[in-house]
Amino acid sequence: MKVYCLLLVLLVGLVSQAHGQLDKKCQMVCTFDYRPVCGSDGRTYPNKCTLTSTACMSQRSITVFHDGEC
């Protein structure tokens, strides 16, 4: 039982560290300028920076499908 608890603690630590590295990699300062873009996922984003940040944090490939709302 102690071994399982130790493994669980180590696993949680590794996942937390990986998530922290992702946060640092995806850290962006986006402005509040409203220049909507339609993402390849069918969602409207306030601007390209927000789309790029969302794609990075979700680890998905989201590109600008076209300018303007979807």
Swiss-Prot record:
Species annotation: Gemmula speciosa
Residues making up the signal peptide according to the UniProt record: 1-20
Major subcellular location class: secreted
Organism taxonomic ancestry: Eukaryota, Metazoa, Spiralia, Lophotrochozoa, Mollusca
PROSITE patterns: KAZAL_2 (PS51465)
Disulfide topology: 26-56, 30-49, 38-70
Listed transmembrane segments: none
Subcellular locations according to the entry: Secreted
Protein name per UniProt: Turripeptide Gsp9.3
GO cellular component, one term: extracellular region
Record note on domains: The cysteine framework is IX (C-C-C-C-C-C).
GO biological process: cell differentiation
